[in-house]
Amino acid sequence: MRSGSTARFVVIHRNANSLYTLIADGTYRAVSLGRNKWKSLVGPEGSLQPNCSKEGFNVVGTSRHSKARIGIIANNENDCLTCDSRIGYGTGGSHDDSNTCGNEARVSPDNGDKHIKAMGYILVQ
């Protein structure tokens, strides 16, 4: 992910025939990178709400709130239904549905409200 002049990467080890098979059917597939690793993609400005932290492929709370094809969503409440923050690729939902790659964070996130649009790079081996 490139934000500003810096590109940052994380590695997700997942066996599949293709990236398409992991995301096309819309099924949630969990990964365990952790909040800090996802936040590192956007650098020191990364911000997420303190609860939920649902991460992986096809991550969705409710359709109008935060979602990500590949990424993490977080909430200020103890559930994952109304998440107002996200980091990832193929993202959308409330506060700025046009931010499809990067970090959106509102409603008491841990590093302040953020609106970071980034360029996404996905390398598949």
Q: Model-found features: residue ranges?
A:
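Mature extracellular or lumenal effector domains of secreted proteins
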Residues: 1-125
